[in-house]
């Protein structure tokens, strides 16, 4: 098998038994693809689909004036180049965006001509604001900060049928309802009331009888009845009544009279229930009509209007109940046939007929007016306005759109064949929905499950941005229509008509402040990836935390392989915010799909298909772990499968699909937990969430027990440097890698050099440190896609969030009570959990009413010592070690001038202007922060003189740019001439400097020739001469390009910065803080086993084993059984085996002997580790160690001395017997337990203790960020009580329960002190402070300010209250 550069250096032993069917897809695809479809950049007009920007323009344009004489049409758009690149945007605090230019055409028609002849066409490109661009890693830079747009899981447009689960009415009756949800436009609801009438609501307003809507659509009473009911025909005769017999309709009824066949034989006697058997007899007997008594006819309802045959007079309207009087009238008027509605209580309810009776309207106009009154109460309706409103609600393309998804879901739910159709509704749609609702009420059909993932779809960045853009365009449209009428006369151009501001504002609002545009979680690479793969049910058009019930939050059968059942926050958002599963993707409609492998006749095929939740129920899907033989045939006769969202056993022949991987169920974070299958779900949830909070440590350390997903996360997160093209490392240092590209991957004439610049010590969103370290050495060969440099929390191309610690499960003097963690001093000494945090401190100089603030080293009333770290501009030096209270940027602000006395005025006049009053408002280091200044940035407003420091920074940056560009050119030039030499040496020359005709060009000749002279050589070979020309052109072009780049950079640096109004200068100081681990810091494993460090013990006091090796961490064994996360114990055992194997390999390397002998022994031992197995536990992956050279084997072995990395993936991990085999190989006791000795006394502990290696994380809940103390500080304005919280430098709340405690103790004076001088007795606390300064500790409590507030509030209610003086 092919190994990547990093894999060859350190192979992870994989215990997986199932061969991989499908590689893990690119993890950020959902973000990148969605936005790519939105921009459709680089596509020609013909290639662009009707979606994204193009779709938004097409849907709003053309904009036609009110008179119809002028129109503005959309032609095309293009995106310009962004002004600043991503890094510059982050530094300057601006948005990374590209200008959008739209080509529009203004068409003016001739008013006079009848057939709208075109009078004038004006076409122009109009600037429409900036569109933020996505970076390569799926983020946006908005105002200098990286943000992520989270995808939203919302209810799909379409039609849904539901009932209230019996909650509305006291009887517990199920009230059914139907709701048509469009993508945009008014909602239409149909619902039953407890009396079984059907009502309609538009946009959740007041309800109206549903037949009003049908009348408004143009249906009359007869039509409505004909549409929703079957009819039964009765024949009226003088001597009685007959009816057409449709035998089936009588099923289940009680016979009110004897039913006999033509021969007079009794079929059903009176009072008996008619059964299926009776119906069969009736059908056989050939009866067509039945004689019925009068009682049977009473209460039946007429289906049509009944008119007197002679006079044409209306005797009875349709939907009238038959009574004795009415029947007599009908018979006497000579009517012989009456059609009645066929209804029964079982499956044909009279709902529409009942609704017609309560319908106050009788024709279309009345119905339209009724709807108008409901939508616009208080406005007088006219015929036109009522018609216009109703048309606009559901039938106008501008106001209503089901969208492609909505139409597909709508048609599928109503059982139609085609998936496409109009975006607006028509009469058939509304009638079909009503019919389906009635069917469900009649017991034919089921209501929908709204939590089914076939009814919820994902809206990603691109779609949300498009909607927002459309909103902006619609706002513009109103203004344009008004201006268009003027355009005819005034000769305006498109530019004068279109105002880009509303569009830009809509986009800015969406990216800047939408609920789904979130500040990127950048703690570590995993948290970045997870944030981009998050799916939220909250946000605009979604749910709210308060209203979401249990069902929405719960795990659903359709989540399988689409949404992770484990990873979701604890707390109020549980189940509303989810994570995509590893293999999930969205289809063109926005529904989540998951891949399955096809099974044909019980045999696996290589074909994989993606299936959405809508289609999944019909398939029979086997687990990935189903038993198969060598040829891929299912072995078991009965296979455990999922079918119709249930798990059952089914014969193997019926299986259609099979999971592609056992980890397709879980998300990326959950798939990083080894032995996940042995952990309780609640703890696994905490484990996945806590991995995202791990702080990158100083030295990343790969997990010895992993899952094999680490490399995918590291590569896809974008924090590493990945080779775009293969080649040889030309040069490498800490800040750049230069690759000479393989000749087969280059284009002719190109230099074939790739230069990668590394990110060094940059602050992340969470103040952690982003730093890249190179892995490659000069001269090494790499392939495209190899990782060349590690990022934060990455070790050799694998995600490394924490450290492998030697742990023991045992109690130790109560120091690990309640999940506390006891840590050895060695851990601190070796800097295992030391992390670097970078804080950005900003000082802003503004223009105030009293004059400008000034950044200067000349600060009033500050000693020399405090200024020692500042330069002459008043800004701290880089490299200065700063402590709390140190000045970073000296700044003075003008103070309000006091009114001068005449004497002062005179003195000023004599001695000249005294330095006007300024106060010190310098930026100082906050309490609790001490570190080193690593960078300073100065931004100056345009038109203001730059200070010396700004000029110095600018010069050094320019020098660096010039140096980089020159270096780049030198590398390119060298590579070009080396390629040319290959092409020229040995060629026959036709001439050249110092060359005879037909001479052969030698290496020596070229070595003595100056480079510019090479291009004068003429050669016979056409290819070589063409290469010479191309190379010369390419070099000249490259030089030009680099010069242009330099000039561009210079221009950007020298022009002033675009700062907020009123801001003159901004100085940003970056301070790096080194945080060692200390008591109070939170740590965790990957199995939800979290705790706080209680004490850091000297190494000599820690328990040690028989070899004298002390453990690093002592954990409480009681944390395991009740929490049921046994995965951590298995990890500990396998970790011990891994480290033991590493030790053995190290011993083999250390022994001095012949190299060949050492390599042979290592080869066989590594083969035993990687490819050995017992019984039938054969791992799917075997390592091809024979393909490794001796050198490579030695490199591999030396990288394994710290422990052989193992992978135990989710649901396909190491079995107990395999762990025991590894322990045996490592020469460790199979029980994994060790005899330990007390470090203090040297006595052995009573029982053996489980000791091994566990991967521990340090979480971003550091005690340094939480420690806080205050003596005096700021107070709240109204109550005069101290503020709360560390950020406000607040006090500790002394609440009512604390007051009760002091009352219970009878500590009256302490209580008085708490409620007065320590809180809000303004005079008392001032006196107290003064007394303490004087060394006098008496207190004189007065009236608390909050009591005065209470008095004032009572007075504001009009109640007089005053204090009596004793």
Curated annotation (Swiss-Prot):
| Catalytic activity of the protein | RNA(n) + a ribonucleoside 5'-triphosphate = RNA(n+1) + diphosphate
Record's Gene3D superfamilies?
A: 2.40.50.100, 2.40.50.150, 3.90.1100.10, DNA-directed RNA polymerase, beta subunit, external 1 domain, DNA-directed RNA polymerase, subunit 2, domain 6, RNA polymerase alpha subunit dimerisation domain, RNA polymerase Rpb2, domain 2
Q: What are the top taxonomic ranks of the organism? A: Bacteria, Pseudomonadati, Pseudomonadota, Gammaproteobacteria, Oceanospirillales
Q: Which InterPro entries match?
A: DNA-dir_RNA_pol_bsu_ext_1_sf (IPR042107), DNA-dir_RNA_pol_bsu_external_1 (IPR019462), DNA-dir_RNA_pol_su2 (IPR015712), DNA-dir_RNAP_su2_dom (IPR007120), DNA-dir_RNAP_su2_hyb_sf (IPR037033), RNA_pol_bsu_bac (IPR010243), RNA_pol_bsu_CS (IPR007121), RNA_pol_bsu_protrusion (IPR007644)
Listed name of the protein: DNA-directed RNA polymerase subunit beta
This chain's source organism reads Marinomonas sp. (strain MWYL1)
Gene of origin?
rpoB
The protein's UniProt keywords, in alphabetical order, are:
DNA-directed RNA polymerase, Nucleotidyltransferase, Transcription, Transferase
**One Pfam family for this entry, by name?**
RNA_pol_Rpb2_6
Protein family = Belongs to the RNA polymerase beta chain family.
Please provide the Gene Ontology terms (biological process) for this protein: DNA-templated transcription
**UniProt-listed HAMAP family:** RNApol_bact_RpoB (MF_01321)
GO MF terms here are: DNA binding; DNA-directed RNA polymerase activity; ribonucleoside binding
């Amino acid at each position: 098998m092919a190994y990547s550069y990093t894999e060859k250096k350190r192979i992870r032993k994989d215990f997986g038994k199932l061969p991989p069917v499908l590689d893990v897809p690119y993890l950020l695809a959902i973000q990148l693809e969605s936005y790519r479809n939105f921009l459709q950049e680089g596509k020609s007009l013909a290639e662009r689909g009707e979606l994204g920007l193009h779709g938004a323009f097409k849907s709003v344009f053309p904009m036609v004036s009110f008179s119809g004489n002028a129109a503005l049409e959309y032609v095309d758009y293009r995106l310009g180049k962004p002004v600043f690149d991503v890094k510059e945007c982050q530094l300057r605090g601006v948005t990374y965006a590209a200008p959008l230019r739209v080509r529009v055409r203004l068409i003016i028609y001739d008013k006079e001509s009848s057939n709208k002849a075109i009078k004038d066409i004006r076409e122009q490109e109009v600037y429409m604001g900036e569109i933020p661009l996505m970076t390569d890693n799926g983020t946006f830079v908005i105002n200098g900060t990286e943000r992520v747009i989270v995808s939203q899981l919302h209810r799909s447009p379409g039609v849904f049928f539901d009932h209230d689960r019996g909650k509305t009415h006291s009887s517990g009756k199920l009230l059914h309802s139907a709701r048509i949800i469009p993508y945009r436009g008014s909602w239409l609801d149909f619902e039953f009331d407890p009396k079984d009438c059907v009502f309609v609501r538009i946009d959740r307003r007041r309800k109206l009888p549903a037949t009003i809507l049908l009348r408004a659509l143009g249906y009359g009473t007869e039509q409505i009845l004909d549409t929703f009911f079957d009819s039964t025909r009765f024949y009226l005769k003088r001597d009685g009544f007959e009816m057409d017999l449709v035998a089936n309709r009588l099923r289940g009824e009680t016979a009110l009279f004897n039913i006999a066949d033509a021969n007079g034989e009794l079929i059903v006697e009176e009072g008996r229930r008619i059964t299926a058997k009776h119906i069969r007899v009736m059908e056989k007997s050939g009866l067509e009509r039945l004689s019925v008594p009068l009682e049977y006819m009473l209460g039946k309802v007429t289906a049509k209007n009944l008119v007197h045959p002679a006079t044409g007079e209306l005797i009875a309207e349709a939907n009238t109940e038959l009574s004795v009087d009415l029947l007599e009238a009908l018979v006497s008027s000579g009517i012989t046939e009456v059609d009645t509605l066929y209804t029964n209580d079982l499956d044909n309810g009279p709902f529409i007929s009942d609704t017609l009776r309560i319908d106050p309207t009788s024709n279309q106009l009345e119905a339209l007016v009724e709807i108008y009154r409901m939508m616009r109460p208080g406005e007088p309706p006219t015929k036109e306005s009522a018609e216009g409103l109703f048309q606009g609600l559901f039938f106008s393309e501008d106001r209503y759109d089901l969208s492609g998804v909505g139409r597909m879901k709508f048609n599928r739910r109503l059982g139609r064949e085609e998936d496409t159709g109009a975006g607006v509704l028509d009469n058939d749609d509304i009638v079909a929905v009503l019919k389906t609702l009635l069917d469900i009420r009649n017991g034919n059909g089921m209501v929908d499950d709204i939590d089914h993932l076939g009814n919820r779809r994902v809206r990603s960045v691109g779609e949300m941005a498009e909607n927002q853009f459309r909103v902006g365009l619609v706002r513009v449209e109103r203004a344009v229509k008004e201006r268009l009428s003027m355009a005819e006369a005034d000769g305006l151009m498109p530019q004068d008509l279109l105002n880009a501001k509303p569009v830009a504002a809509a986009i800015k609002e969406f990216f800047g402040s939408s609920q789904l545009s979130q500040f990127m979680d950048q703690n570590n690479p995993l948290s970045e990836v997870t944030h981009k793969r998050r799916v939220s049910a909250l946000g605009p058009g979604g749910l709210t935390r308060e209203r979401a019930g249990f069902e929405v939050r719960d795990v659903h059968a359709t989540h399988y392989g689409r949404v992770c059942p484990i990873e979701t926050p604890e707390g109020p958002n549980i189940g509303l915010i989810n994570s995509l599963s590893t293999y999930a993707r969205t289809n063109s409609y926005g529904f989540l799909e998951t891949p399955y492998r096809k099974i044909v006749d019980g045999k696996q095929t290589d074909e994989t298909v993606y299936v959405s939740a809508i289609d999944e129920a019909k398939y029979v899907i086997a687990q990935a772990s189903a038993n198969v033989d060598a040829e891929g045939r299912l072995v078991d006769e009965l296979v455990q499968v999922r079918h119709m969202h249930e798990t059952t056993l089914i014969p193997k022949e019926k299986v259609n699909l099979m999971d592609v991987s056992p980890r397709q169920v879980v998300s990326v974070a959950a798939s990083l937990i080894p032995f996940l299958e042995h952990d309780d779900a609640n703890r696994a949830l905490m484990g996945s969430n806590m991995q995202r909070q791990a702080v990158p440590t100083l030295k990343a350390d790969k997990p010895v027990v992993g899952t094999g997903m680490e490399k995918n996360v590291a590569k896809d997160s974008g924090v590493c440097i990945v080779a775009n093209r293969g080649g040889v490392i030309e040069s490498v240092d800490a800040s750049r890698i230069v690759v000479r590209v393989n000749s087969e991957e280059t284009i002719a004439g190109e230099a074939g050099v790739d230069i990668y610049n590394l990110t060094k010590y940059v602050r992340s969103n969470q103040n952690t440190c982003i730093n890249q370290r190179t892995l490659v050495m000069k001269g090494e060969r790499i392939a495209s896609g190899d990782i060349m440099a590690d990022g934060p929390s990455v070790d050799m191309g694998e995600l490394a969030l924490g450290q492998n610690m030697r742990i023991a499960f045992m109690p130790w003097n109560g120091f690990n009570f309640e999940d506390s963690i006891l840590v050895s001093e060695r851990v601190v000494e070796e800097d295992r959990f030391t992390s670097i945090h970078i804080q950005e401190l900003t000082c802003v100089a503004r223009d105030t009413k009293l004059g400008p603030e000034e950044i200067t080293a000349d600060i009033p009333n500050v000693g020399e010592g405090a200024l020692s770290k500042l330069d002459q501009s008043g800004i701290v030096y880089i490299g200065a070690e700063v402590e709390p209270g140190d000045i970073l940027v000296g700044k003075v602000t003008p103070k309000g001038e006091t009114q001068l006395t005449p004497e002062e005025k005179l003195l000023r006049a004599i001695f000249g202007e005294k330095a006007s009053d300024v106060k010190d408002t310098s930026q100082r280091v906050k309490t609790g922060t001490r570190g080193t200044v690593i960078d300073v940035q100065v931004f100056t407003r345009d038109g203001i003189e730059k200070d010396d420091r700004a000029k110095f920074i600018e010069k050094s940056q320019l020098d660096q740019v010039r140096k980089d560009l020159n270096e780049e050119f030198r590398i390119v030039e060298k590579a070009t001439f080396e390629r040319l030499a290959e092409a020229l040496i040995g060629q026959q020359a036709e001439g050249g400097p110092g060359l005879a005709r037909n001479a052969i060009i030698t290496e020596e000749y070229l070595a003595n020739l100056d480079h510019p002279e090479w291009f004068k050589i003429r050669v016979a070979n056409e290819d070589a001469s063409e290469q010479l020309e191309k190379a010369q052109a390419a070099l000249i072009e490259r030089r030009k390009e680099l010069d242009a780049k330099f000039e561009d950079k210079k221009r950007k640096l020298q022009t002033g910065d675009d700062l907020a109004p009123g801001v003159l200068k901004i100085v940003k100081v970056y301070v790096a803080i080194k945080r060692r681990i200390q008591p109070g810091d939170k740590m965790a494993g990957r199995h939800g086993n979290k705790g706080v460090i209680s004490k850091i013990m000297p190494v000599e006091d820690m328990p040690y084993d028989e070899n004298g090796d002390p453990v690093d961490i002592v954990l409480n064994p009681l944390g395991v059984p009740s929490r049921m996360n046994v995965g951590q114990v298995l990890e500990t055992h396998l970790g011990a085996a891994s480290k033991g194997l590493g030790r053995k390999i190290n011993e083999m390397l250390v022994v001095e002997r012949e190299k060949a002998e050492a390599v042979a022994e290592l080869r066989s031992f590594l083969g035993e580790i990687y490819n050995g197995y017992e019984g039938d536990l054969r791992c799917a992956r075997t390592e091809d160690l024979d393909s490794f050279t001796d050198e490579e084997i030695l490199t591999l072995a030396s990288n394994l001395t710290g422990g052989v990395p193992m992978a135990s993936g989710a649901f396909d991990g190491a079995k107990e017997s395999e762990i025991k085999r590894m322990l045996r190989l490592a020469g460790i006791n199979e029980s994994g337990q060790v005899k330990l000795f007390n470090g203090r006394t040297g006595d052995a502990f009573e029982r053996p203790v489980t000791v091994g290696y566990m991967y521990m994380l340090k979480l971003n809940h550091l005690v340094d960020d939480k420690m806080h103390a205050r003596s005096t500080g700021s107070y709240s304005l109204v109550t005069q009580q101290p503020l709360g919280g560390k950020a406000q430098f607040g006090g500790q709340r002394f609440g009512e329960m604390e007051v009760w405690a002091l009352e219970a103790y009878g500590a009256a004076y302490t209580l008085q002190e708490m409620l007065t001088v320590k809180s809000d007795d303004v005079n008392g606390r001032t006196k107290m402070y003064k007394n303490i300064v004087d060394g006098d500790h008496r207190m004189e409590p007065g009236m608390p300010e909050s009591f005065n507030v209470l008095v004032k509030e009572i007075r504001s209610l009009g109640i007089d209250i005053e204090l009596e003086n004793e």
